[in-house]
Amino acid sequence: MSASGRSAREKLNFQLGLRRRGISDQAVLRALEDVPREQFVEPHDKEVAYADTALGIACGQTISQPYVVAYMTEQLRTHPRHRALEIGTGSGYQAAVLSRLCRQVVTVERYRTLADTARARLAALGCRNVEVVVGDGYDVPDTLGTFDRIIVTAAMETIPDSLMERLEPDGIMLVPVGPPEGVQQLVRLRKGADGVEQEDLIPVRFVPALVGLAKEL
C-alpha cells in the first residue's frame, strides 16, 4: 500500500475509533479530521501519529494521545465566537484543533524551542487566529485579556488565582489537577454568578506544569 493510502486508512480508523469511544460532537470530529496530526509529531513518529498513545516531543514534553485531545476539546464546549486560552502549547496540535473551533486562540508555552516550532507549524497550516506566547502558565499577564474558554494541558497541583481571573463570566476551564507523578483528575470549572462550579471528569496522566520560564531550551 502506498504511503498516501496508508495515511488515509489510518485517518479513517482514527475517526472511527473516536466515535466508538463516545466522541460525538461533529464540529470537534471535523476539526480533528482537518488537522494533520503527523505534522505535529517528531519525524521518527510520523508512522504512529494516529496511534492512541502519547508521544514524546522536544524538551521532555509529550503530545497527548488523540482520544484525550478529542475528549478535552469536546468537554470544553466551544463556540465559533469564543476566545480560548491554552496553557502548555507543546507541539501546537491542541491549538491547531481549537483554531478550527474558536474565533481566537492564545497559547502559552514556557519553552521557547517548543513555542518557536509550534508557531512555525501553525503558520504553515494557515492558523492565522492563533497567537503563541512564551510565558508562565502560573502567571498569565493581564495584558492577554480574558477568555471564554481555558484549557490546561499539563498537571497543576493547585489552580492559580491569576488563571481564574483570566476566565470570563460563564466561562469554562479544563485542567488536570493532581500530583506531578501518577494519576490526576481532569476537572471542569464553570465560572458562574454564584461562584465557581467544579466537576470531576476522568482520571488522566499529564506532565507537570512548571512555574516560571525555562532557563534553557
From Swiss-Prot:
Catalytic activity entry: [protein]-L-isoaspartate + S-adenosyl-L-methionine = [protein]-L-isoaspartate alpha-methyl ester + S-adenosyl-L-homocysteine
Primary location recorded for the protein, binned into one broad class: cytoplasm
GO molecular function: protein-L-isoaspartate (D-aspartate) O-methyltransferase activity
Biological process annotations from GO: methylation; protein modification process; protein repair
Coiled coil: none
Localization in the cell: Cytoplasm
EC number: 2.1.1.77
Alphabetical UniProt keywords: Cytoplasm, Methyltransferase, S-adenosyl-L-methionine, Transferase
EC class (word): transferase
Function: Catalyzes the methyl esterification of L-isoaspartyl residues in peptides and proteins that result from spontaneous decomposition of normal L-aspartyl and L-asparaginyl residues. It plays a role in the repair and/or degradation of damaged proteins.
Entry's family note: Belongs to the methyltransferase superfamily. L-isoaspartyl/D-aspartyl protein methyltransferase family.
PANTHER family given in the database record: PROTEIN-L-ISOASPARTATE O-METHYLTRANSFERASE, PROTEIN-L-ISOASPARTATE(D-ASPARTATE) O-METHYLTRANSFERASE
Designated name of the protein: Protein-L-isoaspartate O-methyltransferase
Source organism of this protein record: Afipia carboxidovorans (strain ATCC 49405 / DSM 1227 / KCTC 32145 / OM5) (Oligotropha carboxidovorans)
Gene assigned in the entry: pcm
